Amino acid sequence: VSDRDILPGPATGLVPTVEASPDKLALRRFLRNPAAVAGTIALVIVVVVTLIGPIISPFEPTAIDLTQVRKPPSGEHLLGTDSTGRDVFSRLLAGGQISLLVGFSAALVAVAFGTLAGVVAGWFGGIVDAIISRIIDIMLSVPAVLVIIVLAGVIGPSVPMLIIVIAGLAWPNPARIARGVVLSLREEEFVQAARAIGSRTRFILARHLVPGALPPIVVSATLLVAESVLLESSLSFLGAGVQPPQSSWGNMLNEAQSLTVLSSMPWLWVPPGLMIAVIVLSAMAIGDGIRDAIDPRKN
């Protein structure tokens, strides 16, 4: 499929139309990427099913039934039950809401704050850039899991704590990307022209620089969603994240710490493990697809 459509004309027979916009070209390239399309479909399905979880859940996710302990999948319990007789399918849906809430919220906060910090550093330069750059370097060297475990012990593990701490540890990546883009754009002629005619700094940043930084930041955001979901699941598995009776995919995997469960009760750990894998792989595929679609070398 050509990026330029040819339409019949009255004089020459063929008249080239206006070339497709960069956005349309990027979308076209994204839709030609099978992995990115499959990842998008999978992610949308998981998110939609999780959101309507309270409607389609056959049981309360926290309802205990000691007469149904560790029952295999059946017509009554589609994915079986856990060690206290709770329905695994209902817990999977409820846990998905928590895991996705943490993943998307942490990524959104990190991208918003990181973009702001990076744009400020790149635009003002000098001591402002030096201070923010040193903070970014320090934050990138901090072991995230260790910090969250320590804070969970001091503050107490909770969903808001996870979102804030994960976002606080993740913002340097989008900040570094935004800073690099602004540094490369601030000396461009269109930016200098805007400054020469007296445009306010806020207008220049919002109109010219932030839009230029958005494509790579969107790619970073999709990867941050995957990292945040994976980090929340790891922490909940270790007991430093979401706490029972509230469910998350991570603390559902906590049930699979014995060889007996691993070998003979796969319904307890395969569903949450599969959901984590689907979200992480889908987000990474989408990020790769967006990166390839906006790559200037493909124009």
Describe the function of each predicted region:
Residues 3-9, 41, 49-84, 234-247:
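Hydrophobic alpha-helical transmembrane segments of membrane transport/permease proteins
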Residues 40-47, 147-150:
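Hydrophobic alpha-helical transmembrane segments of multi-pass integral membrane proteins
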Residues 29, 56, 78-81, 261, ...:
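Residue-level signal for helical boundary/lining positions with a hydrophobic bias
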Residues 30, 48, 138:
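Residue-level signature of catalytic and energy-coupling elements of molecular machines
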Residues 24, 34-44, 83-299:
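Alpha-helical transmembrane segments of integral membrane proteins
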Residues 1-42, 285-299:
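Transmembrane alpha-helical segments of polytopic membrane transport and secretion proteins
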